[in-house]
């Protein structure tokens, strides 16, 4: 069912609404870019301040290849300027660390509960750097990288992955999950916990997640598939949003895009109160609906609400120049 809704409200009010929306988007994009950059660079700033005092007597090395006894509750902390990073979780109570740098700039320390690897450019050297780690499942993983791809599989513990320029792939994590990148794609699956993602550019795709999820991007499409979360928040300035998953009783789902379409694909037996707002878009619904006018004023002239089932969950969608699609799962379109 396709519904094109008439624009209402004075022209002056509409123009001011557009101006406020553009201002809000510009401010949001600037804040997001600054937040991601600060998060990635903070570790390096702290490292530089303490570098001479803490590591002045430690030699640089070009290669690490060792296996140590390591607790499943331990922390793996890796900070690097560049290089490909691969981390895999396994069932052993030990960690295998393999790292190589043509620049000879690796620093390594380890105990039974914490592993720390640091790498940085020195004396203008260039060259390849790579890391491969196998750690006990359940370990906490922290990665700070300026340039390079990060892949983590089956870690099944808390994860903090932050890059300035590089793709991130995360498959299997539990607990607190934080991901950020300034420029790079993010692909994730099998996540259980509280998930937070900040990105400026690049694509975001997550499959199979439980718990809560919050995603904020500037110029990215957001794809969320096979989710069973009680709370989902996704916002993007110039991308599209797809949410495909369950709607949990008393759950809250909020999806907002300025210039992209928003698609919500949920089971036919879902129970939710659906609220949508759009300026120049249309609503396309697989569900039979009866529109109930919501809050209507000069600043919000096109906001409507309706119930699916008994309306137990809350779904909010908002676009400025995009369409909103409400689809039944499994429906061929």
Where are these regions (language model features)?
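Intrinsically disordered, low-complexity terminal regions
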Residues: 1-333
